[in-house]
Amino acid sequence: PTLHSARLAISGSGGIGIADSCGLQFVQEVFAEKNCAEKLNPGTDAVIELGGEDAKILFFGRHFDARMNDSCAGGTGAFIDQMASLLNVETPQMNELAQQAQNTYTIASRCGVFAKSDIQPLLNQGAEKSDLAASIFHAVASQAITGLAKGRPISGNVLYLGGPLTFMSCLCDAFDSVLNIKGVCPENSLLYVAMGAAFCAEHEVDLTTLPEKLQAAAAQHSFEHLPPLFKNEDEYTVFKKRHSKESVAIGTPEEASEAFIGIDSGSTTIKIAVMSPDGKLLDSFYQSNKGNPVVAVRNYLTDFYTKYPHCRLLAGAVTGYGEDLIRHGFGVDYGIVETMAHFYAAQYLEPEVDFILDIGGQDMKCLKIHNGAIDNIFLNEACSSGCGSFLQTFAEILGYTAEQFAQIGLKADMPVDLGSRCTVFMNSSVKQAQKDGASVANISAGLSISIVKNALYKVIRPASKEAIGKHIVVQGGTFLNDCVLRAFEQEMDLNVIRPNIAGLMGAYGAALYAQRRYKDAPHQTTLLNLQQLGEFVHTVKGMTCGLCNNHCHLTVNTFAGGKRFISGNRCERPITHMAPKDELNLYRQKLQLLKELPVNETPKRGIMGIPMGLNMYELLPFWNALLSSLGFKVVHSPIEDKTIYRLGQGTIPSDTVCYPAKLMHGHIKWLLQQGITNIFYPCMTYNIDEQGTENCYNCPVVAYYPEVLHANIRDLNKPEINFFYDYLGLLHKKKLVKKLQEMFAKAYPDITKDEIRKAVDAAFTAFYDYEAQVKAKGQEIISKAREEHKPIVVLAGRPYHIDPKVNHSIDRLITNMGAALVSEDAVSSHIKTKELNRDLQVLNQWTYHGRLYAAAEYVAQNPDMHLIQLVSFGCGCDAITADECRRLLEERGRIYTQIKIDDIDNLGAAKIRIRSLFSAAQLFDIDNN
């Protein structure tokens, strides 16, 4: 029988507008889901639900609590869809792949585009897709737990709801593994919100008239829009004509007997340029690498040799994310960092170029040129929402190729104002615009404008339009999109140069570089020939290195003849089987000093545990001496144990706090697991006064994180645990003695004031000895580097940035490139702080900040030194220090380099930044000499 009426209610993120327009009952989705779970699954303790763009955890019990994602759609169904697209598989295949996994990698899940920055280098290095699929599921589970549970334990009877958890058993397994539980995905798990809404429905609705009401509601919407990119067809014709003037001469391989080849193995695409000795582009290749750049390069070279046997390739160069893999696999003569490749190409086309903007698949490079040399480099730090993959993702979602999507956007009459949000969350804005009646053309144009705003206001951040330059070259595949190019010119109100080979400039620059190097030293090319390509073999195997405590996940690529390329290593040990040489690395020498601190082996008062993180990387010598003097044996948590983070993951209350702070939860958990009942980690508003700064504050996280740990790690509140987290200061000895006596009074009333006074004296002596050793070792490294004519890098950060878990061995990456390395505290004392304060544009009131400013000033005064600042994601304070350090360096004509770090240990982007700095500095020196 036909159903004419029913009790009906609507729920879900898109339901409230429909309910209002049609006069229907709306039930909030959390309430609907809670209602259904209580009716169908009594005794449920928690619900974890992943949807398309939302994620939620519901806690049942005496106090019901709901946690939902608010500003980021990372770690949801849309995130998994995007990762499947990146792996070039259908979403359902992700589960099949994950079932075959042998290893897992650390992948970011806070942002879909940022995750590409972790996955794409692994793909380019030959990592197995099955391992990556499993890693993505683990990342989603970690994101949900740390981002939503915020430290609240998840245990007991747990339901898994929503599409991703329903259709992907390996995702459920990942949650089970991280939470150490066995959750249940119930029958009708997709329908709990709908069934809950039905249980709540109170009013009968006439179903025969409902379709008309829904259609009427759909026609009422409108959307915010911007002016069109082109007013009419004539304006577009003039635009095309202007940009057709800037071009590289085009030839054919038939007309040349010799050529140079450049390969750009990018994040998502492979670009190849074959160039004649007089600069003509003879042949080119541009396509998606489909997660396997090796196959694409082999096919191209085989095809070229077969078609043009008369055209001899004299030399080749490779650049991009896959540079090392392609160079090893195909015997390419030279490698060049991609920033320099793009610079060579732009300078060849426009000798007076003073600014280059390259937007690729997931990275953005901005090069400031002065007097024919690179003066400064900007790269997108983490987010790729202003890049080509951003547009490509949406084109595919809407059912178009990137080229079709761009053409459609040219005809937009009302581009949607989408702002500049992150990729995964932009899904919501695009879907809302569609509901509001926006055409695909207006969405395409709106997204192009968003890309430009991201580039300008989140990466370049110019003080004015004039500051960018007068001779601007834009390149990269994204600028082949006329919508993006037009949006950039409109936003900046100036005309720019887009070469006819904008998408090939990296490859063309690599070919120019190969030609330059070949002219300097002619030789027989090492490129594989046609016969060798016919015998070409490439196998990939994942393994975990056991040669040190890093336990790096290695990807071993084996080629014909047994030649191997290993990636994923953070030192040379897997290749050389020798321990890294750290005599010119102050980071490692500081760690060694901390490891060699004396231990009280005859403690009269037992063991005192110290969590080895944050300010303990500076103050351990102080507290070790003090506590040892008081009769304790000091045991600190491990320095190089990568499992520490997961130990405390479930107790982290905020996903936005910096990674070094998150690690503290694991350090405390480790100490508790060892049965240690005394844990010492005091709150410290102030640091040691280093004289000259306006004050000597610690940052709020360093100062007060013990409070966060006490509030979120329940075991610290057990009666048998003594957690010493009182507020202490090192500015006044007498006050410190008094506070320590008060702190220990309850647990150790026998500790006398005289004992504490002697212990404090011993602590200050030990600390100043350690400080002197650091400065002396730093000076030794600087002197030796100058004797050996090595570049000197001041890797400037905070004390805890020497932690290998935090810096991911970036220090060794730098020294492996041939540089000497010191930390900011080794050089900061050379600067008179009071004089520096007069030049600063910020209040110098934080101890760590003061060292950074002084180090930047010292580097600016020493031409053989370069500063690289390490910044942890989530560090609000370093938003200030980064700008001020940049200013101090750039006003002296020096290059500022920043590397942002968190829990992700793939160093592909960091390597590009460091090589770019060294290459630019070398060019600058040559130019000035």
Language-model segments: residues:
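Glycine-rich phosphate-binding loops at beta-strand->alpha-helix junctions
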Residues: 14, 148-178, 189-193, 319-322, ...
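Conserved phosphate-binding/catalytic loops in two-lobed NTP-binding clefts
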Residues: 26-30, 176-195, 333-340, 489-508, ...
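An N-terminal assembly and electron-transfer interface module characteristic of large anaerobic redox
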Residues: 69, 73-80, 383-391, 398, ...
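Glycine-rich phosphate-binding/hydrolytic loop that grips phosphoryl groups
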Residues: 80-82, 187-221, 344, 388-393, ...
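Phosphate/ATP-binding catalytic cores across multiple sugar-kinase/actin-like superfamilies
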Residues: 132-156, 197, 240-249, 446-469, ...
